[in-house]
């Protein structure tokens, strides 16, 4: 993992320092948005966010990605300190944009999000988070409060010796358009979600 560029990034959430990283031996680039002092600090509020063009940019209701991104940046801004890693190459759980749209078409025919990927001969989830752990190491983040519903992220950070002190829930609205998607992730991937009545 190589740090290739850094610059100030003013946003509607506040001002971040942006760090662009390139994965060794590949074309993948990831972006870290950092607010405040995170080096050698305990329990840094952190989000590992998988790229999702349809959700993050266009506000698609098929998933909860865009709302999780927005909420994560709001939490970091409110605290005045934190890290958001925007992980490129994770589109459609790592299958790419075109294949994600093909999977959407299968979902419209009744397949769930996992079945659709498998029907296309693709993995149910091709993402890796080792790159995220490497970036956190470069940023000298020693422990995190992780904003995530995905247990795979917790496991990867633990394997790399980055303690997760707390899981910060990202409770975004379940909509008619994404309810089946969210329930499938909960049932098939063990994602953490709240019942709205809890």
From Swiss-Prot:
Query: What InterPro entries is this protein classified in?
Result: GTP_cyclohydro_II (IPR032677), RibA (IPR000926), RibA-like_sf (IPR036144)
* Pathway note: Cofactor biosynthesis; riboflavin biosynthesis; 5-amino-6-(D-ribitylamino)uracil from GTP: step 1/4
UniProt KW Hydrolase keyword:
yes
Q: Which Pfam families match?
A: GTP_cyclohydro2
Q: Which GO terms describe its molecular function?
A: 3,4-dihydroxy-2-butanone-4-phosphate synthase activity; GTP binding; GTP cyclohydrolase II activity; zinc ion binding
Q: Name one GO biological process term.
A: riboflavin biosynthetic process
Q: Which residues form the active site?
A: 125, 127
Specify which residues bind GTP according to the UniProt entry for this protein. Answer: 47-51, 68, 91-93, 113, 148, 153
Look up the record and name the cofactor or cofactors this protein needs: Zn(2+)
Which reaction is catalysed here?
GTP + 4 H2O = 2,5-diamino-6-hydroxy-4-(5-phosphoribosylamino)-pyrimidine + formate + 2 phosphate + 3 H(+)
Which domain of life, per UniProt? Bacteria
Record text on cofactor binding: Binds 1 zinc ion per subunit.
Task: Provide the residue positions that the database annotates as binding Zn(2+).
Answer: 52, 63, 65
Q: Which family does it belong to?
A: Belongs to the GTP cyclohydrolase II family.
Q: What is this protein called?
A: GTP cyclohydrolase-2
State the organism of origin: Burkholderia mallei (strain ATCC 23344)
Name of the coding gene: ribA
């Amino acid at each position: 993992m190589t740090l290739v560029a850094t610059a100030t990034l003013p946003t509607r959430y506040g001002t971040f320092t942006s760090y662009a990283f390139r994965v060794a031996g590949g074309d993948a680039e990831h972006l870290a948005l950092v607010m405040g002092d995170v080096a050698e600090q305990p329990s840094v509020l952190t989000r590992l966010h998988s790229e999702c063009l349809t959700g993050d940019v266009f506000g698609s209701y098929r998933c909860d990605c865009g709302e999780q991104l927005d909420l994560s940046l709001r939490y970091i801004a409110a605290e005045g300190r934190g890290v958001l890693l925007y992980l490129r190459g994770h589109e459609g759980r790592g299958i790419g944009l075109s294949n994600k749209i093909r999977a959407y078409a299968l979902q419209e025919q009744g397949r769930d999000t996992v079945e659709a990927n498998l029907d296309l001969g693709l993995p149910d989830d091709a993402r890796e988070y080792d790159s995220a752990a490497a970036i956190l190491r470069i940023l000298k983040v020693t422990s995190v409060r992780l904003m995530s519903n995905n247990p795979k992220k917790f496991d990867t950070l633990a394997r790399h010796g980055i303690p997760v002190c707390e899981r910060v829930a990202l409770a975004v609205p379940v909509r008619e358009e994404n309810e089946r998607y969210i329930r499938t992730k909960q049932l098939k991937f063990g994602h953490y979600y709240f019942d709205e009545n809890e």
